[in-house]
Every structure is written in structure tokens, then in C-alpha cells.
Amino acid sequence: MANLIDGKLISTQIKDELKEEVTELKKKGIEGCLAVIQVGNDPASSVYVRNKKKACEYVGIKSLSYELAEETTEDEILKLIEKLNADSSVNGILCQLPLPKHIDEDKVIDAIDPKKDVDGFSPQSVGAMVIGKPGFLPCTPAGIIQLLKRSNIDIDGKSCVVVGRSNIVGKPMSLLMLRENATVTVCHSHTKDLKDVCKNADILIVAIGKPKFIDASYVKDGAVVIDVGIHRNAENKLCGDVDFDSVVSKASHITPVPGGVGPMTIAMLMSNCVEAMKR
């Protein structure tokens, strides 16, 4: 039976450490402020934005919320970002994705000042990550690295398979695992013999966007399984990309959904916000 990797517990530990750091920074007159832009009222996005605000409150960072109508133009969003870039009291800016179809996400991300890009999505942040320079790391992959390290799971020299190649999780995840000296394979919709590739993984990280897609037949005995997916099943219960019930008896460690990767994403956003305060 696998050990559960408790993302809630680990994320709270991180937020408590950050809270202490923020208190010390405030004594030096350094304040933190995160501006969150949400376009439209997608229910999932609203939940994420609410959780981000709560986390800001917890660690002692001020949050500004810009809730814009679905029909807001790209130009209006870019003007708002320009204003926030110029506001020295704002250290972090994030635009909650996905954006409505008529808005070019890349253009919006590119408009955010790299020094305030606490999501770690800007070309400058990504470039710094590729060559191992300091910069803001994307929150979900950075959170997964913390989950592994704080659970005393050795990454060095291990075979890691990342299923999914999105710009937000899959690609940066593979780079961060490479930084930790894992031997990394990235799988995607064109990968042949996916099952065989996954079965070679000491650490299997799944971000494929398909509910319960990875079952026990994809997992070798004793593997560490990290589930990035989040979906609602027919009974309206949350589930991941991994079929937890079948994999839990085969893995050595596994993240649950909910309560695994999700809380870590927000903890690492707070970590980036604190980093932005110090710059």
C-alpha cells in the first residue's frame, strides 16, 4: 500500500515559513502586493482566484483583484497590465488562465513585466529556467519538486517519466527534474507504447488531462506516482488523471486528488510573491 504524499500538510509548512519571512520583510518596510486579473466568471477559475486570495491573506501579502467581464477586449487587459507594471507598490501580477477565446494568452503573458511574473510563464522566466539561471519557476512543477524533496524521495539518478507536454506543467516539469539529475522521458499523444514507457519510471508524473487514464498496468511496483490532473467524475466527485484505487496498492508513494499537487501550486505562487518582494 502506497504512502500518501500529503500536499495540504506540506503546503501549510511552506506557507508558515513564508509567513515568517514576510513578517521579517515588513519590519524592514518591504510590503508585498499581488494583483490578480480574472476575465469572465469560469467557476473553476473563480475557485482558484479565491484560494490565491486566501493564501495571500495567510502569509501577509496584500492582494488586488480585477474581475473583468467576459467581453473585455485584449487591448483593455493590456492597458491594465501596463498600469500594474508601472505601479511600484505591486510586486506580482498574474492573469488567471484560461482566458476567453478572443484574447491571445501569449500576448497577455508577454505583457507582464518579467520582474512581476510570479506565475513563471513569461519567455524570460522560461529561458532562465532552461539555462538554470535564477528566476520565477512555474508554480505546479516547482510544487512537485518540493513535494518530492520534503517527502524524502530521492530524485538523483532516478528514471522519471512525465506524461504530458503542456507549457504550464509537462515541459517545465521535465526541465526541473533534469536539474535534479533525474533521467527524464516526456510522453505525449504521439508516444508509441505509452504503457511500456511508463512502466520503466521510478517517478511517474501524470499531467495528461484525462480522468483516471493511468491505471495499475502503467505503473511498476514501488514507483512514486504524482497526479497533476483534476476532474469531476459522473458522481461529481473530484478525481485525477490516475486511477487512484488501482494504483495505490502498487506504488510506493502517491499524491491524492484533491489534497496532493493542488495546494502546492498555490504555496509556490506565494513563494514567488515573497521572492518578488525581495527583488
Curated annotation (Swiss-Prot):
Transmembrane segments: none annotated. Keywords: Amino-acid biosynthesis, Histidine biosynthesis, Hydrolase, Methionine biosynthesis, Multifunctional enzyme, NADP, One-carbon metabolism, Oxidoreductase, Purine biosynthesis. CDD domains: NAD_bind_m-THF_DH_Cyclohyd (cd01080). One of its GO terms (molecular function) is methylenetetrahydrofolate dehydrogenase (NADP+) activity. Its EC number is 1.5.1.5, 3.5.4.9. GO terms for biological process: L-histidine biosynthetic process; methionine biosynthetic process; purine nucleotide biosynthetic process; tetrahydrofolate interconversion. It comes from the Bacteria. NADP(+) binds at residues 164-166, 189, 230. Pfam families: THF_DHG_CYH, THF_DHG_CYH_C. PROSITE patterns: THF_DHG_CYH_2. Pathway: One-carbon metabolism; tetrahydrofolate interconversion. The keyword Amino-acid biosynthesis applies. It catalyses: (6R)-5,10-methylene-5,6,7,8-tetrahydrofolate + NADP(+) = (6R)-5,10-methenyltetrahydrofolate + NADPH; (6R)-5,10-methenyltetrahydrofolate + H2O = (6R)-10-formyltetrahydrofolate + H(+). GO terms for cellular component: cytosol. Catalyzes the oxidation of 5,10-methylenetetrahydrofolate to 5,10-methenyltetrahydrofolate and then the hydrolysis of 5,10-methenyltetrahydrofolate to 10-formyltetrahydrofolate. Belongs to the tetrahydrofolate dehydrogenase/cyclohydrolase family. Homodimer. This is Bifunctional protein FolD. It comes from Agathobacter rectalis (strain ATCC 33656 / DSM 3377 / JCM 17463 / KCTC 5835 / VPI 0990) (Eubacterium rectale).
